[in-house]
């Protein structure tokens, strides 16, 4: 992979933006354009750029007023655009696993839930049923624990949608249905799987 200096990277520092959402929305659009241009000739490099942007989004946007919904919409559109770029990159399973580890860390660090939609794409991001099954096995014990009748609290885990998406992509449909039946609260986001 050739060395590449992403123009957007310096613009997405932690707390880089004030409270107004106009500038971050514009910067997200510019970053997407930059990544898509690179994707035409170097899909693996573009996928790496997509991961870098996803890692940087939430920390950079934490201080922005997102009450209008424009910022959330821009981030969701970015995820919708970036996921296929990451999926299409033809890489070794070990590199894809490292990418997923980085994305999982970004999801865990997502304090303002800007990139939570990424979990819905987890099965696609895994690309292979084997990798999806591996991630399902990672997430499954935690989901079962938070959905247990004995669990205290409200039963939230940032990896729930990623677990369900991984089970689906791995072809473990019966296991997915059994798990969904264990949910303490019946939410459409979980039951659609």
What does each model-identified segment do?
Residues 1-193:
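Eukaryote-biased, non-catalytic alpha-solenoid scaffold regions
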């Amino acid at each position: 992979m050739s060395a590449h200096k992403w123009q957007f990277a310096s613009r997405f520092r932690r707390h880089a933006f004030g409270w107004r959402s106009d500038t971050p929305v514009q910067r997200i659009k510019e970053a997407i354009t930059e990544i898509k241009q690179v994707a035409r000739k170097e899909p693996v490099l573009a996928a790496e750029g997509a991961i870098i942007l996803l890692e940087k989004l939430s920390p950079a946007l934490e201080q922005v007023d997102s009450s209008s919904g424009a910022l959330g919409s821009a981030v969701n559109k970015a995820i919708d655009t970036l996921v296929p770029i990451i999926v299409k990159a033809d890489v070794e399973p070990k590199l894809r696993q490292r990418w997923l580890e980085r994305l999982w860390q970004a999801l865990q660090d997502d304090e303002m839930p800007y990139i939570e939609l990424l979990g819905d794409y987890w099965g696609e991001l895994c690309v292979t049923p084997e990798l999806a099954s591996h991630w399902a096995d990672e997430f499954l014990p935690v989901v079962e624990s938070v959905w247990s009748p004995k669990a205290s609290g409200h039963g939230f885990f940032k990896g729930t949608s990623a677990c369900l998406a991984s089970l689906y992509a791995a072809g473990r449909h019966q296991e997915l249905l059994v798990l969904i039946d264990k949910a303490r609260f019946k939410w459409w986001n979980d039951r659609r799987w």
